[in-house]
Every structure is written in C-alpha cells, then in structure tokens.
UniProtKB/Swiss-Prot annotation:
PROSITE patterns: EPSP_SYNTHASE_1, EPSP_SYNTHASE_2. Phosphoenolpyruvate binds at K22, G96, R124, Q172, R345, R387, K412. It is found in: Cytoplasm. 3-phosphoshikimate binds at K22, S23, R27, S170, S171, Q172, S198, D314, N337, K341. This is 3-phosphoshikimate 1-carboxyvinyltransferase. One of its GO terms (cellular component) is cytoplasm. CDD domains: EPSP_synthase. Belongs to the EPSP synthase family. It catalyses: 3-phosphoshikimate + phosphoenolpyruvate = 5-O-(1-carboxyvinyl)-3-phosphoshikimate + phosphate. Its main location: cytoplasm. InterPro entries: Enolpyruvate_Tfrase_dom, Enolpyruvate_Tfrase_sf, EPSP_synthase, EPSP_synthase_CS, RNA3'P_cycl/enolpyr_Trfase_a/b.
Length: 426
C-alpha cells in the first residue's frame, strides 16, 4: 500500500492556479461533440474522469486533438447524434460525470451501447435517469442489478414529451436529461419530483448549453421546457474554469494557517456554485477577498458553523476537516448525497475524523464535528476517493501531522495535488 506522510506545517503562503473543473470539462466535451463546428477547449482538466470521457468519444468515432499537456482539446463536432454500426462497450471507470451524460446522449442516435465501470460504479444509482429516458421512449436494460450500471442501450432516438425525474439524489441525472433534450424528436417538458439537490450544478449545465446556443426555460427549478429543433453550435473557443471544489482545500489552508493563499481560475464571475465555499469560510471567521477570477484566504481564528450545505456538497467535505481547527461544534446538514458519491462519504468522513480524536455525530443526512483539544496523528484511509485524500491533507496543520493511505487516488481530479499543497509550505 502506498502511503504519504505529511509532516506538520506551520505556515502557508502562495498562489495556486487551479486545474480545470471536472464538471465543466466533461459537460463541455460532450456538448462540443454534439455541436456543429470545431470547439477549442482550454484549461481542460487532465485527470482520470476526463480520460474516460475522451476514450469513449474516440471509440465512438469523434475526432479531437489534445495539446499542451492534455489541457487544450480541439473537438470536431458531429452536428447531431452519436451512432454506431456495431455494438460498442464503453468502460467509464468510476466517472459519474461521464456515465450519466453518455447514458442519456447515446439514446439519441442509432446503435447498441453497453456502459460498464469499476465495482464502485455498480453501486452508484442511475435508475432515476434511466426511468426518465424510458418515459421518452428509450430502450435501456440493466445487466446486473436494477437501477445500477452496467447497462445496455438499444438506441432509436428520443421521442420528446412530458417527463418526470427525481431531483433529490443527484443533479447529474437532470444535467444529463437537459443536455440531450434539445435533440429529441419533440419538445421536452421536465418536471422535478421532490426537492432538487445541488442546484448550482444545474446552473453550470444551463450556462454551458447557452454558450452552445441552446435555450432552456427554467421555471424556478420546478420544471424545465426545452424546444425541439434547436442545434448546438460551437462557440469556437471555451475556457474551462478552475475547479472550485479543488480550490476549497487551498482556501481552507489559507484560513487555517495563513499567511495568504490566492487561488486563480475561479472568482466572482465563476459559474460554479462551489465558490460559495469561500463564504462559509468567511462565516467561520476567515478573511476572504474576491476578484473576478481569483479568491484570497487569510488566516484568522475560526469558529464553528451550523449550515445547510446541500448547494455545495463536494466543497462541504472540506468544512468537515477544517472544523478540527474551529472553536465549537460544526454541523453540516442536508448532505445525504454524500452517500452515493465515490464512496459513502458520510460514513467514511465520520470514521476517519474519529481516528484523529474528533467527536462525530453521523446522521442520515448530516454530520457534526467537535474538534479534540489536540488532534492526534493517524493513518487515514481514502476509500479510492480523491476528495477524502485532499480533505485530510488539512491535518498537516495540526502539530502531529498525518499519513494518507493510497494518496494516488487524487488522480481522479487533481493528479499533482500533494505537490501543489506542499509548495504552499515552502
């Protein structure tokens, strides 16, 4: 087993240019594929999840060219839908941002497509998306367990019409449905069942669709109307913002042990909801400064917060470990969808926080963290989850340091994370 020892860090200072957003990268790759014209994507994330998407697109006959350390991608759009003359099997690892949108996109054309992934992917639900696609005439069948990958699509196109989709589990289901709706054979009217989680991620989807020339009527996130006959048109060039979830670790570092940490690539003009993580740090007492495309965090005495963090579920994980350096008990609420991510993040977070001495109350959809008087060192299991590894790097700011097991799991979104993290201490 690979291990990484992080020795205690007294102070952090510096500037970090955040790699491209995973959410934006994979959405943009798919939209560029379906669009008319050639799109140049810059600051594309170079990571496992993006590689699974790129490999699948290549297998499906899409032409693209990667340059500049895989961060610039020129995609030749197909001006329509994906078809296959022979049956195709696509392996998508544990990349939800590839599995969900491709599942929807492949129903639009003609052909037989089987989508598979790693064992954890077979535990991540997709049933709500498949149910909605079936309402529009899609033929999708499960190969193992109902509601979960692997699955096979016998594609003949989507009919259009009225469709209901559950909104309370993952915003990726709605994102996938929205992106394919303009290419259905008729108008699509989407009604949300239950409360929609992670609304800011839907805003990312709608903003990108608009950049590619497609309009969606958003009725206050209760329903969405998409007119048929719209086409995706390449915007020519598209800059992928830095990943706001990845920015959270460096901003937290600045708040805990700054000095001053500046992250560039995200800021006031960001389309990502996770930039609101900086507002949570400010509520905890950190000194936060905003620019159009940067955020600065400076160290200060931190206090606990009690907040609904449904709108920033990924970045909220960083608050759970930052809470170890705050006075009082921090409550993070309305985060059930942590349980269906790369691992059951609620259970994993509770287990690992207890290892360092925290008092933790783990509920169905919340976690409460009371810091120990003095955290103690531990070997932190990462559950093949990139965010677990990055969150627990915060323990380097305790006097004891920390050991991270299997640190290479950060390759999913931020392959050189620990190099960048350690650079702040030097």
């Amino acid at each position: 087993m690979n291990q990484l020892r992080l020795e205690p860090i007294e102070k952090v200072n510096g500037t970090i240019n955040i790699p491209g957003s995973k959410s934006i990268s994979n959405r943009a790759l798919l939209l560029a594929t379906l669009a008319e014209g050639t799109t140049t994507l810059t600051n594309l994330l170079d990571s496992d999840d993006i590689r699974y998407m790129l490999a699948s697109l290549k297998q499906l006959g899409v032409n693209y060219r990667l340059t500049n350390n895989n961060t610039v991608c020129e995609v030749d759009g197909i001006a329509g839908v994906l078809n296959a003359d022979t049956a195709q099997t696509l392996f998508l690892g544990n990349a939800g941002t590839a599995m969900r949108p491709l599942c929807a996109a492949l129903t639009l054309g003609q052909g037989e497509f089987t989508l598979t992934g790693e064992p954890r992917m077979e535990e991540r639900p997709i049933g709500d998306l498949v149910d909605s696609l079936r309402q529009l005439g899609a033929d999708v069948s499960y190969l193992k367990n109902d509601g979960f990958p692997p699955l096979t699509i016998n594609a003949t196109g989507l009919s259009g019409g009225d469709v209901e989709i559950a909104g309370d589990l993952s915003s990726q289901f709605l994102t996938a449905l929205l992106m394919v709706a303009p290419l259905a054979k008729g108008d699509v009217n989407i009604k949300i069942k239950g409360e929609l989680v992670s609304k800011p991620y839907i805003d990312i989807t709608l903003a990108l669709m608009a950049q590619f020339g497609v309009n969606v009527t958003n009725n206050n996130y209760v329903s969405f109307e998409i007119k048929t006959g719209q086409r995706y048109i390449s915007p020519g060039k598209l800059l992928v913002e830095g990943d706001a979830s990845s920015a959270s670790y460096f901003l937290a570092a600045g708040a805990i042990k700054g000095g001053e940490v500046k992250v560039t690539g995200v800021g006031k003009l960001s389309i990502q909801g996770d930039v609101k993580f900086a507002d949570v740090l400010a509520q905890m007492g950190a000194d936060i400064e905003w620019g159009d495309d940067y955020i600065i965090a400076r160290g200060s005495k931190l206090n606990a917060v009690d907040l609904d963090m449904n709108h920033i579920p990924d970045a909220a994980m960083t608050i759970a470990t930052a809470a170890l350096f705050a006075t009082g008990t921090t409550h993070i609420r309305n985060i059930y969808n942590w349980r269906i991510k790369e691992t059951d993040r609620l259970a994993a977070m509770a287990t690992e926080l207890r290892k360092v001495g925290a008092i933790v109350d783990e509920g169905h959809d919340y976690i409460s963290v009371t810091p120990p008087v003095k955290p103690h060192t531990a070997n932190i299991d990462t559950y093949n989850d990139h965010r677990m590894a990055m969150c627990f790097s915060m323990l380097a700011f305790a006097d004891c340091g920390i050991t991270i097991n299997e640190p290479e799991c950060t390759s999913k979104t931020f392959p050189d994370y620990f190099t960048q993290f350690n650079a702040l201490a030097n």
